Amino acid sequence: IRGSDYPSILEDNRIDIPYADIAVDGAGGALCAIPFRQIHGRIDSLGFRIGNVAYSSDISDLPDESEDAVRDLDIWVVDALRRTPHPTHFHLEKTLKMIEKIKPRRAILTNLHIDMDYETLINELPENVYPAYDGMEFVENQAIEKQS
């Protein structure tokens, strides 16, 4: 991948037209998603919107042109790698500022580094923001369960 410091280990299946619907068919049935451009350090990455849910991992910035893709969401699953700034990922403060700007109904923080303790985060995050955990499941427009 041009500009990346990491060798590619996956088969290259390019999505050349961001913001245009793509369809994927798999074991769970057909799925329609809208890819949108994100910044991931010196390279671009793609986020995906599926209905009123968006997924943004590997993101260090969201270009203005992509903001409409994450407006009016029920759930935004979004990168929050660690507490301190990182060159290729959102850090907690930046993630929370973006959540405040984009205003999803709820947000789930993902790609959390080991120093992002679940119990600590649960006690300090805004009421509509949840740290993800292994095995977490959610359903659009239904309550998000906290890990017990």
Task: Please provide the spans of the model-predicted regions.
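Binuclear metal-dependent hydrolase catalytic cores
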Residues: 1-56, 122-148
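Short, hydrophobic beta-strand segments that form beta-sheet elements in well-ordered domains
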Residues: 54-57, 108-110
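A general structural motif
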Residues: 36-40, 57-64, 87-90
